[in-house]
Every structure is written in structure tokens, then in C-alpha cells.
A protein has these predicted regions:
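Catalytic core of pol beta-like nucleotidyltransferases
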Residues: 1-23, 32-36, 48-97
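Conserved histidines in hydrophobic membrane contexts and catalytic metal-binding motifs
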Residues: 26
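Short hydrophobic/aromatic beta-strand micro-patches
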Residues: 44-46
Length: 97
């Protein structure tokens, strides 16, 4: 299945809210409108209240289960500045607290 950005928002928002993340932005092929059946979902997360790796693992699992697709979950705190500047032009906000 190839999701629309609105479908991605509908799946991600309740999960993000339940975990207390500050924001989620879509990047990669879905954000650029180039997704195929084989595309994974690339999400940049500002963790907000999330501090433990265990809870981040739960967030990852719930999003992956929601999308039924491979997922690339990157945190703003864990990504280097060069990577963030490279994806910034393609980012699409999908959740903001």
C-alpha cells in the first residue's frame, strides 16, 4: 500500500500523542511524493517527554504496526546536523503537540 500524507497523519497522530512526543515530521520518499509499494516510512521525531530507549522502542513498534511497513525512525536529538540540514527541505509536519 502507498499511503497519502493525510493517511500517515491519521495513523501517526494518536500514537505520537499517547507517547508524549513533541513533534513528528515525515521525510524521504513519502514526503517528496515519490513513494512506491516498497518504500519505508521515514519519520523524524522530537522526543519531547520521551527519555528512555525502552519507550522509544515501544513508539517504534507501535508506528511500524500501524503502518504495516518498514519504518525509519530518527530522533532530532540523535541525528547529526548535516543529516538534518539535508532532509529539511523535504520535511512534512505530521504531528505537533
Amino acid at each position: 500500500m502507498i499511503y497519502t500524507i493525510e493517511q500517515i497523519r491519521q495513523i501517526a497522530r494518536p500514537i505520537a500523542a499517547a507517547y508524549g512526543v513533541r513533534s513528528m515530521r515525515l521525510f524521504g520518499s513519502y514526503a517528496r511524493g515519490e513513494a512506491t509499494e516498497d518504500s519505508d516510512v521515514d519519520i523524524l521525531v522530537d522526543r519531547g517527554k520521551l527519555r528512555s530507549g525502552f519507550v522509544m522502542g515501544g513508539l517504534y513498534a507501535d508506528l511500524r504496526d500501524g503502518f504495516q511497513k518498514d519504518l525509519d525512525l530518527v530522533t532530532t536529538q540523535g541525528a547529526d546536523a548535516e543529516f538534518l540540514s539535508r532532509i529539511r527541505p523535504d520535511e512534512v509536519m505530521i504531528y505537533e503537540q
